[in-house]
Structures are given as C-alpha cells and as structure tokens.
Amino acid sequence: MKKLLLTLAAGIVLCSCGSHDPQIAIVPYPNHLETGRGTYRVTDRPVTCDSRTDERTQRAVVGFAARLATVTGGTNPVTVADEVPASGISFVTDESLPAEGYELNVDGEGIEVRASQFPGFLYALQSLEQLLPAAVYGTEPAPDAAWEVPCVKIADAPRFAYRGMHLDVARHFFSVDEVKRYIDVMAIHKLNTLHWHLTDDQGWRIEIKRYPELTAVGSIRKATVVRKEWGTYDGTPYGGFYTQDEIRDVVKYAADRGVTVIPEIDLPGHMLAALTAYPELGCTGGPYEVWGRWGVADDVLCPGREKTFEFLEGVLTEVMELFPSEYIHIGGDECPK
C-alpha cells in the first residue's frame, strides 16, 4: 500500500512539473501566482469563517485548525462571524468565483481565502497546507519547523471537471482504512472522483442484502496465480468485502474531502464471482469457481434468462441507495460471445 501511494504521488508530481517558482511546491500548480516579500507565521493565529460558509466548509476549516494546532504546538481557535477581521486566517464567501475556484492571499497581516462553495475552500486549504512545512501532514508536534507561509497571491480553478483515480479492490482487496488513505492522497492533489472497481471474476467486494451468497461465496477465491506462471498457484484463500455500513462510511469520508465515489459493478462479463455464488445466472449452469488468475473468462451472465435481469435490478437498486453519485459504472467490456 505504501508503494502504491508513493507511486501515485510521484506520478502526479511529475505530470505537474514546469517552469514555476521553485519556492512554491503546490500540486497541481495554480493558474495564477504572484510571490511577495516576507512570510506570515501561523502559530497561535485565530481562524474565522464568515457566516455564509456552509457546514462542510466549516468542518473542513475546523479540521485544518486542529491539525495545525497539533503540529505547531499552539492554538488556532475557530469562530464563525458575520464580519471577518483583517488579521489572522479568514475564510470569506465570494459568489463571483466559480464553484471549484478560490483565491488565496497571504501578506504580513494574515491569510485570506475566498471561494464561493465548499470545493473552492477545500482546494484553497490543500494549497495552504502545501505552502507549510511537510510536517503539517504529521500527527506529532514539530515545534522546530518553520511554521510560516510565504506571502503570495493565488487565483486558481481546475481545468477539468472530472479528475479521477481508479481503485481495483476485486483482484487485490484494500481495507477501509487503506481506501481512506487513498482518498486522502487524492484530496491532497485536488482529485475529485474515485472510480471504485468493486466486482470482477476474482472477487465480489460489496454486500448486497438481497443476494447474501455474493459475499459469503463470491468474495473468496481458493488461491491466486503466482505472477504469470499460469499453472502455479499460491494455495492461499484470499478474500474480503465491505459491508453496506462500511460503504456508507467511505462515501461520507470521501464527500468530506471533495471526492465523489463512482461504484463499478462489472457486467455482463467479469462475473465469475457472482456465477459461483448463483450458478443459475450463467448460460451453462456451471460448475463455476471464483477465478484465481487474470485475463478474460469465457463464462458470463446469461442474457437469455429472466433471472439475470431480476438479479441486476436487485443489485443495482441496492448500489444506487448506497452511492449518491450521478453515475454507476457497469463495465461492459471483454464479454465473450
């Protein structure tokens, strides 16, 4: 997992390189940035949200202030007010800015963040944290770090509406905590969409109450192929799945970090895990087995059976209830005739 996160972060950094101010290490680099003289020290500074900021923005600001207080060893009290002071760290609603845009201004008197909606405030916070020492991402006090922000004027907004990452948990299962860490890395880099690949031939990872065998049987494969030696298996059962409560928890966690989760239920191919649990959904009746290898399996959902469509309606209905995303991904690829 650590290697995956480091690779993800390194790849994003490399893709964002350019002829920018080497003193400013914000990823992705802002659309407009002016550097000034001097710095502003953030230790023991009051934090103010104007009263027009929404609840999610205020929660994000409170979280930022708490993390800041932890690593600096100081205090950063948060208040909500109709008028924000000229000094300290302030968050001001500016409806002239786009939904995901923000302005971040730092001078000797304080830090002012302006945005119109939650995403803009969130991305401003990410940029602000990247202007601070790396210890800001820690959980222990770092009093010897230089807790100062360079004086800058930033105006930024994303170029692309969809900025996503894909996570396949069917072939390799990730715990809830690992998925959350993945989301954290996405949020740091202002990515806003997680494509969560929850089912495949190698395992079914989401609880469907109407079809309990999907996880009781379909979440576990007997063994996994060793690298590309197709005839050699490790002999170790492998599995795991997420309960619906865990799914809700991840979806909320992601939403609080500006990330929408799009679930993928791959169909009509890539369905060996489901066929193993419910063989009557296949064209041959089986026997089927959760796949322990990679590639494209010949066995798929049978479109000539009414039960297949009842199954899909039941599964997708529960999935829609769990994910507020506008979209559900249904795969549709690599389906042998």
Residue spans of the language-model regions?
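Intrinsic disorder/low-complexity segments
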Residues: 10-11, 82, 87, 241
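Positively charged n-region of N-terminal signal peptides that target proteins for export
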Residues: 1-4, 261
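Acidic, contiguous N-terminal accessory segments
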Residues: 17-161
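Feature activates predominantly on carbohydrate-active enzymes
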Residues: 97-309, 313-329
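N-terminal leader/propeptide and maturation segments of large enzyme subunits in energy/redox metabolism
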Residues: 333-336
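Short acidic (Asp/Glu) and glycine-rich catalytic loops that position anionic groups and cofactors
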Residues: 15, 43-44, 291-296
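Hydrophobic h-region of N-terminal signal peptides that target proteins for export
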Residues: 6-17
